[in-house]
Amino acid sequence: MARYIFITGGVVSSLGKGLASAALGALLQARGYKVRLRKLDPYLNLDPGTMSPYQHGEVFVTDDGAETDLDLGHYERFTGRPATKQDNITTGRIYQDILTKERRGDYLGATIQVIPHVTNAIKEFVLSGNDGYDFVLVEIGGTVGDIEGLPFFEAIRQIRNDLPRGDVIYIHLTLLPYIPSAGELKTKPTQHSVKELRSIGIQPDILLCRTDRPIPKEERRKLGLFCNVRETAVIEARDADSIYAVPEAYHAAGLDDEVLAAFAIAAEEPPALERWHKINERIRNPEGAVTIAIVGKYTGMKDAYKSLIEALSHGGIANKVEVKLDWIESEVFENEDPAPFLEHVNGILVPGGFGQRGAEGKIEAARFARERDVPYFGICFGMQMAVIEAARNLAGIAEANSTEFGPTSEPLVGLMTEWLRGNELERRSQAGDLGGTMRLGAYPAALKRGSRVSKVYGDVLEISERHRHRYEVNTAYKDRLEQHGLRFSGMSPDGVLPEIVEYEDHPWFIGVQFHPELKSRPFEPHPLFSSFIEAALVRSRLV
């Protein structure tokens, strides 16, 4: 039977509960346990799919097509276990399910209330589908004291009483701020955070304390005394230079030992952390460096590109180099020459996005990369803009554009209306809702034999990648574009939807309709990112 670890946060938001959960999951996994990580999000949206990147950050897409919180990306990267739509739920989804049942008459006329109906729905979600796992780690989004989080805290309080004694523990992630004028770490915010947690019936078993310096023994003793936890359960979570150093740091601080002790499990062997040590050595001691320009439209919010940043880092690990990122707002190129911004970089990456703002700037970035032989990686929207650039400047289709931006006489990119998922035909219309109407999740793509991308993948002819898009390159222009050198080297198996384009006579120019960053892992870097960084490294030695 699975044991449950609930991770809560206090004092301030954005402390890194998702990263802490992922790191603990990796440590337990390194001890031979099977782990599952799940996330409860208290917001009222059904999912983050229609939320602004500036509000929410990245939308992480799973193989089964769920649009989820970016923390699920941390879970996958640290444990290697693919997440599913059953690993993330929001208040919105819970209320939708409850109200659907109420309209159907399932509650037989009962008054629907937060307790027991909402809390029971949360408990049912948390406790379902966990057979075969040793530990289930559940992160509760937000901060203790948030009004929208109260039903979730009540539900996890009840779960401890519902399950056998010793099958549930609570870990509270908190902040110890350093006050320079006083010259000390302050414990009072943590004390008040734990007081708030205890007032709703939850006594944390472990305090995970974010800090930028060692916790003195006296502060550790004070936290244990006033927060009612063992002194050994006050764990120091020091700031790290790399997120991949966190599992080793947490082990050194005793987190995994304390978790096992809380469950009365004897820690017989230390965790096998050799592979973590190996990649951290590569990160700390690179043999070179490359600079990649990310030409995007959400560059002011780095969390909007979280998986992308990590995938580039993985490419650097594979090539033993440091990857430096130069963030460029794509709108800049609509009024200025891109050369001064891009001449010094070793590679250009244009990521996914939606809407017309900044599109012309991305087209200019693709043109610069093509004309100057700079390695170019276009992802989703970045592929579409590269195709429009080729149509305008190589094929002579001056009015080439995307219908996403409005009516056009030359729709190089248009709205998909139907596609195959397995053997089933899925349909969409222009008038459909924005939420949940995209081509989402894992789909296969057939690669052309002998193409660059086929070689990058190891000479395979079919791959499976995750998608999140509503628009697609128009195959009516395929022949004209190929006549001018843009090769369609990957298509959907039925030959209807373009998946990959490339230039054969370019050092490295690949556009993909899918999101390869979502499947990259530190121990298994995605081949496209490894190859892209390798090409950037070659260029760095030429200029």
Swiss-Prot record:
Its EC number is 6.3.4.2. Residues 291-542 form the Glutamine amidotransferase type-1 domain. GO terms for cellular component: cytosol. GO terms for molecular function: ATP binding; CTP synthase activity; glutaminase activity; identical protein binding; metal ion binding. The keyword Magnesium applies. Pathway: Pyrimidine metabolism; CTP biosynthesis via de novo pathway; CTP from UDP: step 2/2. L-glutamine binds at Y54, G353, F381, G382, M383, Q384, E404, R470. SUPFAM superfamilies: Class I glutamine amidotransferase-like (SSF52317), P-loop containing nucleoside triphosphate hydrolases (SSF52540). Pfam families: CTP_synth_N, GATase. UTP binds at S13, K186, T187, K188, P189, T190, Q191, K222. It comes from the Bacteria. It catalyses: UTP + L-glutamine + ATP + H2O = CTP + L-glutamate + ADP + phosphate + 2 H(+); L-glutamine + H2O = L-glutamate + NH4(+); UTP + NH4(+) + ATP = CTP + ADP + phosphate + 2 H(+). Allosterically activated by GTP, when glutamine is the substrate; GTP has no effect on the reaction when ammonia is the substrate. The allosteric effector GTP functions by stabilizing the protein conformation that binds the tetrahedral intermediate(s) formed during glutamine hydrolysis. Inhibited by the product CTP, via allosteric rather than competitive inhibition. Belongs to the CTP synthase family. Residues 1-265 are annotated as: Amidoligase domain. This is CTP synthase. ATP binds at S14, L15, G16, K17, G18, L19, D71, R238, D239, A240. Catalyzes the ATP-dependent amination of UTP to CTP with either L-glutamine or ammonia as the source of nitrogen. Regulates intracellular CTP levels through interactions with the four ribonucleotide triphosphates.
